[in-house]
């Protein structure tokens, strides 16, 4: 029992230590910018190069939000859920640390017709305007009555 308590305490201590180190690290690629002011999501979208991201012309559902980085998984899940894709994916960013309180823009668009569904989303850093993540999916429905 004592060994188990020591192991649990040690794990908690090291997790807290690593979190503290990550928060105090001065070499963050994307530190917190929670208190900075940035343009609204609609203004940013209008100024955005449409080669980077453009909503579908006939979109059935679109999202434009300025959120904190820690809210990205929830927004991604909400978008996928509202567009009938019930799987939750993990958001993994490599080679850089992004502070949870970093402001980002989240844009998503969904379009469908009788045979096809298209989804796409993008996460863009509000300060540097660099793309942090994007995703696209396509699904084709076959007509079961055609031969």
Predicted feature residues:
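Positively charged n-region of N-terminal signal peptides that target proteins for export
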Residues: 1-4
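Long, terminal "pre-/pro-" and other extracytoplasmic accessory regions
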Residues: 6-8, 12-147
